[in-house]
UniProtKB/Swiss-Prot annotation:
Organism: Chlamydia caviae (strain ATCC VR-813 / DSM 19441 / 03DC25 / GPIC) (Chlamydophila caviae)
Keyword Ribosomal protein on entry: yes
Family: Belongs to the universal ribosomal protein uL22 family.
The protein's name in its UniProt record: Large ribosomal subunit protein uL22
Subunit architecture: Part of the 50S ribosomal subunit.
HAMAP family, sorted: Ribosomal_uL22_B
Keywords linked to the UniProt accession: Ribonucleoprotein, Ribosomal protein, RNA-binding, rRNA-binding
Single GO biological process annotation from the record: translation
InterPro entries referenced in this protein's UniProt entry, alphabetically: Ribosomal_uL22 (IPR001063), Ribosomal_uL22_bac/chlpt-type (IPR005727), Ribosomal_uL22_bac/org-type (IPR047867), Ribosomal_uL22_sf (IPR036394)
Gene coding for it: rplV
Amino acid sequence: MFKATARYIRVQPRKARLAAGLMRNLSVMEAQQQLNFSQLKAGRCLKKVLDSAVANAVLNENVKREQLSVIEVRVDAGPVYKRAKSKSRGGRSPILKRTSHLTVIVGEKER
């Protein structure tokens, strides 16, 4: 199993989990095709992490790309940056800028 992570990505975890659902239990080639045509920002981030995990497998262990499949995709919540927007009568409303930690684990297909 080969792992790649991206931390503190400025994508809401809720939206990133939608993109993660596109690639679960697929081969690496199929997952890359799914993410290529995804319109989500999280899809682009997950594709980079997937490519990194595949590169780890190919370069470190000489595994063929065709034999790899996505074993696990995890999207965890990172820290939340808090900002404020001014409102009427001296008030304020909070703006929460959420971040995500993305983890992709790939491995050889079970036969």
